[in-house]
């Protein structure tokens, strides 16, 4: 009996071992399947840590057991399967050069990855340059450099525009008095000794209207007679003096008043001289001229202007205006600062009586 019972027990033990063998094999296969599932999980997105509700710490054995218990034994390749959409944070690229306080670290940074594998961008962990750090890019702007500088503007051009510093007097060894006018890159030397009696031909008559509309008077009664010695030399330097003085007196627009009364025919300059004056006159002076007012124009003055029309522009011709008396001139501009020669006043009284002025 004892032998039969022992044999039965051995038989039961063997049957149990045989029955447990498939379970052990299934458990081994299940473990292999888990390993394969973990390897495949690198290719497929996993559940969010908040949704899984488990810790993903690889050193926590309890977490491994719970993850193994919740991992499916098969992959459902067909049908609807809840998948988490993987969001990748954009790379943060700063095109800044290396600063002195970065310790060799490049300022070009990418979004840091969190230890749990999520793609949340931690703004507080990004390194930003402090206010005390200065970049060595060489493109920093100071308060003085924000406005462009006129580097190409020379001293002579600045003086010409401002009307200061472009004229000085020089005395020669022979006692001649010279005046130098600097007009841009050019310098004009004027023999003031020979033109001293004729300097009154050009004068400043104040301003007209709003702004800086200067009034320039040209009194032809002060011109030299053509019978004097060195007439061409005197007229050339007189023209230089008039142009240089205009550059000093005229800042913007101006009104030129020609007082032709009291001028003899011997004082009328030749046509070639007037044509040369017009061509040599700076374009700025021709453009800024608002009007040329001719007072007491005689027939030969009008004939002169008619002969000059082929050589002057139509715009300049339309700027010419003729007045018959000083009274008409007083209605156009103020005569308080205008110096009118006595010969012109006498002619106006002879033509219009005492009420002319």
Swiss-Prot record:
A Gene Ontology BP annotation from the UniProt entry: negative regulation of cell population proliferation
A GO term from the CC aspect: nucleus
Single Gene Ontology MF annotation: identical protein binding
Known tissue expression: Isoform 2 is expressed in placenta and lung.
Ranges of residues in domain CRAL-TRIO: 191-352
PROSITE patterns reported for this sequence: CRAL_TRIO
Gene3D superfamilies per record: CRAL-TRIO lipid binding domain
Segments of skewed composition (Polar residues): 105-117
The organism's place on the tree of life at top rank: Eukaryota
CDD domains: SEC14 (cd00170)
Record field: compositional bias (Basic and acidic residues): 32-49, 136-149
Pfam family, one: BNIP2
Keywords: Apoptosis
Bias kind Acidic residues: ranges: 119-134
Disordered: region residues: 32-156
Function description: May be a bridge molecule between BCL2 and ARHGAP1/CDC42 in promoting cell death.
SUBUNIT field: Homodimer. Interacts with BCL2, ARHGAP1, MIF and GFER.
PANTHER family in the cross-refs: BCL-2_ADENOVIRUS E1B 19 KDA-INTERACTING PROTEIN 2-LIKE PROTEIN, BNIP - RELATED
Protein name per UniProt: Bcl-2/adenovirus E1B 19 kDa-interacting protein 2-like protein
Organism: Homo sapiens
Name of the gene: BNIPL
